[in-house]
Amino acid sequence: MFQILKAEKTIGFMRWSKVAFVFSIFMIAASIFTLSTKWLNWGLDFTGGTLIEVGFEKPANLEKIRTALDAKGFGDATVQNFGSAREVMVRLRPRDDVSGETLGNQIIGAIKDGTGESVEMRRIEFVGPNVGDELTEAGGLAILVSLICILLYVSMRFEWRLAAGAVMALAHDIIITLGVFSFLQIEVDLTIVAALLTVVGYSLNDTIVVFDRIRENFRKMRKGEPADIMDASITQTLSRTLITSGTTLFVVIALFMQGGAMIHGFATALLLGITVGTYSSIYVASALALKLGIQKEHLMPPQVEKEGAEFDEMP
């Protein structure tokens, strides 16, 4: 198998587990503090508001449109291409004093005045605050249910100490990612929820690969402390981890740089989540299982007595 690193010597990952724990606790505490003070910059999918799609005769200049809307008092508008360079989507937060139709006409007028181009309204939609609340609850419930299912799955496949480490690693990834979004006030919409669920699956996959090697080595390596066996297991899977994470990050970075405003938040969430998830599969999931006292006997298969074995032992 192709390898980036051919480690002839086992890397002592667990030697740095205390430093990693301190770092993780600091990042989680900082994220929770940021979330509690600034919270999240919810998008229209969650807060409600107005969505207006307009068409141009030639490729639209988004910066010119933003400047035109800002001059007319619509500085909170989100402007991005939709479908093609001639189609533009404008998102606005709820405005109680203006109806949806009136707001649409004001937007069209502001764009025409600011750009001097012919503009056609394609569609206008209004997302009520009740729908936004339902989406918020559904998104949070989706993440919670996924964590519970993962806890049950890993408990059945491996052992409860490893399951606790896996779930804590996933919670660690989500909290830190949301903390960065809160600190930077990046808009959170449904694509961000999809990205978080993707991060959960990606991080879990990486963790399961490491755990599978840990279980295999616990059964094969008769000598050595649990920390030594974990170091050997992580070292053996390190090349696979770097190849998988690296190739995925190349694609995500391309999306981040060239994907446009519509998927910028999605790419940012994946970029943060994959980076933090690679770290947590080593220094949160595995290290926490070690702190909880994982031993060889916990992962050894149960011995099954053969029928009639007691008669075979008789002289």
UniProtKB/Swiss-Prot annotation:
Q: What Gene3D superfamilies does this protein map onto?
A: Multidrug efflux transporter AcrB transmembrane domain
Topology of this chain in the membrane: Multi-pass membrane protein
- Cellular compartment(s): Cell membrane
Q: Which residues form a coiled coil?
A: none
Could you tell me one molecular function GO term of this UniProt entry? protein-transporting ATPase activity
The family assignment reads:
Belongs to the SecD/SecF family. SecF subfamily.
Role of this protein: Expression of V.alginolyticus SecDF in an E.coli secDF mutant restores protein export in a Na(+)-dependent manner, strongly suggesting SecDF functions via cation-coupled protein translocation.
The name this protein carries in UniProt is Protein translocase subunit SecF
